[in-house]
Structure formats: structure tokens, C-alpha cells
């Protein structure tokens, strides 16, 4: 085991520019996390809108709730950190299609000066659960509005669940018969990707 005497960071900061040319050292640093949301809906032709679930709607609701969320803003005065912001949001469709997209992804820049990754994950799970509830309510409302106009559509309440990456891996391991088989298939998949692939885009 290692015994740490001190933790130092020499990363340059904007506010040291123009000052005396001495090498600065800092007693702390900003924590950065890039949470990634994979939103899975249900594909259906646009004519059968109510029978599907548009993953783009779910992703849009994630952005609506997390973008600039004041609950994540840390610091005070000149040390106030920027709020969460979405760096990418897109549907996952291979080609042009007139079906509701079944998958959409978005990821964010989240900064903190005190929260642990576990703390942030718990807060993000709360947001994801709120998103799921809002999206399902919106889809149900749309179905009711179509029915009121005389459309022959099924009126069913959408349901879903929020899974962390850990939850997803554990589920996959159970379905595949264990951790070793999951690791083997995961490795095989990763080897099919171009070596220059940005893993956030895989």
C-alpha cells in the first residue's frame, strides 16, 4: 500500500495567466464526470405511433431536466463551477427510416468539487426515474388525444425501468450464464470496432 504525503496538481489554470512566472501548485482540483444515458424505446412505424415508444422523446426529457440543473452547481463567487451541459444527443439509427427510433443516447459534462461518483450516480438515477415517468405520461396523453379524435388506437400505459451500467452488466451475465461468457462476448464485440472509434460513440 502507498502512504500519500500530499496530493498536488500542476494543471494550468486561466486565472494564473499574466502573473509572475512561478510554477503554481494547487491543493485541490475539480472533479469531472461524463454521465452517459442510453434510452431504449420501442420501434414502430409512424402510422402505429401509439404502439411504439420514441427513444428520442426520452432522451429529450433527460436533456430538459439535467441541462443547467442548479442542484449540481458547486462553488461560490469566482470559484463557481459551470452547471451540467449536454455534449451530445442523438438517435441510433443506421439509415433513413420512418419508424420511431428505438435507441437514443446523450452524455453530459458534470463538474463537482465535493460529490463522489456514487453521489452523482444516485442523483442521476433520480432524474432518470423522473424522466421515465414524464415520458410515459406524455405517450399516454398522446394516445388519449388520438382516441378523442376518433382514432382506433390502443390505450395502454407505458412502463419502463432505470438500470445503471452495473445493473445492466449483472443482467447480461445472468442471461449469458456467467461473468466469463459475458467478458468473452464483450471482448469479441469490441474487437469488431475500428481502433479509432470513440468509445462514447460505439
Language model segments and positions:
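Metal-dependent amide/peptide-bond hydrolase catalytic core
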Residues: 17-19, 25-27, 33-34, 41-202
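Acidic/histidine-rich catalytic neighborhood of metal-dependent amide-processing enzymes
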Residues: 1-28
Amino acid at each position: 500500500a502507498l502512504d500519500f504525503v500530499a496530493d498536488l496538481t500542476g494543471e494550468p489554470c486561466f486565472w494564473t495567466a499574466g502573473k509572475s512566472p512561478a510554477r503554481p501548485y494547487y491543493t485541490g482540483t475539480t472533479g469531472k464526470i461524463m454521465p452517459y444515458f442510453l434510452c431504449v424505446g420501442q420501434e414502430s412505424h409512424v402510422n402505429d405511433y401509439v404502439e411504439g415508444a420514441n427513444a428520442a422523446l426520452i432522451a429529450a426529457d433527460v436533456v430538459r431536466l439535467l441541462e443547467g440543473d442548479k442542484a449540481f452547481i458547486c462553488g461560490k463567487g469566482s470559484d463557481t463551477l459551470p452547471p451540467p451541459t449536454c455534449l451530445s444527443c442523438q438517435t441510433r439509427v443506421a439509415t433513413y427510416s420512418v419508424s420511431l427510433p428505438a435507441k437514443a443516447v446523450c452524455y453530459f459534462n458534470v463538474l463537482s468539487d465535493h460529490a463522489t461518483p456514487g453521489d452523482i450516480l444516485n442523483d442521476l438515477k433520480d432524474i432518470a426515474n423522473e424522466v421515465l415517468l414524464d415520458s410515459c405520461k406524455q405517450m399516454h396523453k398522446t394516445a388519449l388525444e388520438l382516441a378523442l379524435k376518433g382514432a382506433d388506437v390502443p390505450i395502454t400505459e407505458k412502463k419502463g425501468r432505470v438500470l445503471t451500467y452495473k445493473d445492466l452488466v449483472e443482467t447480461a451475465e445472468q442471461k449469458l450464464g456467467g461473468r466469463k461468457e459475458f467478458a468473452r462476448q464483450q471482448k469479441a464485440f469490441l474487437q469488431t470496432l475500428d481502433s479509432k472509434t470513440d468509445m462514447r460513440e460505439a
